[in-house]
């Protein structure tokens, strides 16, 4: 757990920060364990942008490093993309005070973006691709075995809907990803963390936040619309966002329509198979078993009991015809 200084906080604020810190550390620890993100001897390149998410990620990883049963190294890396007005002194001062190893890189991707993207258009996509390429190359240069990025649960869900709505794909951000060339392993330790928790934590910790819109680019309108949609769902339908994320971890290719993920053409029936009932497992109305007291998760025990009951019911033949 992070070391919390409570001198400047009221007792209520200190209690809230302690609870929030425990939750975030627990969620990061669980994500790391679930996806085996960090292993003995790893050198983790922690990408620090100056935003709330990457600050929180670095802070939590450093705290977990002190108590972890394995040994791993953390190196913070920031890429100065030469955006006008970028406060170059903030991150070095913060990292010096923290006592963590770090590198500040400089590469003028801003000029490239301004040259390629028409005035008034969102530059975020090209900017992030250029940044990613530079960071991937530097990770190999310093011998980093993992690249840690600060994407959280909201980012993952937003990306899922963006791809569904605008690209026709069921695709999100995996908590752990091997780069296309196989040279870099990307991890997202905040994958289980809610953005609103991270924002509150960052405010308590008083991280020296650097705004991401120094370039003058506006937020991607599509992502903004999806973010607003999810906020409304979270407000009016508690548990829905949690249920969506749970569903992303419980996919059933055989119950979908993607022929690349499941061999539908190869399906064959077994005429000698014992009868299990007149309701297929996939036809169970899962929504009948929503456990509203458990963040909207499905009550699997209730669903199975209902399935077993249906299987035991006798089928009465009330009419038949044979020509």
UniProtKB/Swiss-Prot annotation:
Q: Subcellular localization, per the record?
A: Cytoplasm
Documented EC number(s): 2.8.1.-
Which Gene Ontology terms of cellular component type are present?
Answer: cytoplasm
In which residues is [4Fe-4S] cluster bound? Answer: 124, 127, 215
What Pfam families has UniProt attached to this entry? ATP_bind_3
Give start-end ranges for motif PP-loop motif: 49-54
Pathway, according to UniProt? tRNA modification
Q: Which GO terms describe its molecular function?
A: 4 iron, 4 sulfur cluster binding; ATP binding; magnesium ion binding; sulfurtransferase activity; tRNA binding
Q: Which cofactor does it need?
A: Mg(2+); [4Fe-4S] cluster
BP GO annotations: tRNA thio-modification
Q: Which UniProt keywords apply?
A: 4Fe-4S, ATP-binding, Cytoplasm, Iron, Iron-sulfur, Magnesium, Metal-binding, Nucleotide-binding, RNA-binding, Transferase, tRNA processing, tRNA-binding
Primary residence: cytoplasm
**Task performed by this protein:** Catalyzes the ATP-dependent 2-thiolation of cytidine in position 32 of tRNA, to form 2-thiocytidine (s(2)C32). The sulfur atoms are provided by the cysteine/cysteine desulfurase (IscS) system.
Further information: The thiolation reaction likely consists of two steps: a first activation step by ATP to form an adenylated intermediate of the target base of tRNA, and a second nucleophilic substitution step of the sulfur (S) atom supplied by the hydrosulfide attached to the Fe-S cluster.
Protein name as annotated: tRNA-cytidine(32) 2-sulfurtransferase
Which lineage is the organism of this entry classified under, starting from the top rank?
Answer: Bacteria, Pseudomonadati, Pseudomonadota, Gammaproteobacteria, Alteromonadales
Q: What gene is this protein translated from?
A: ttcA
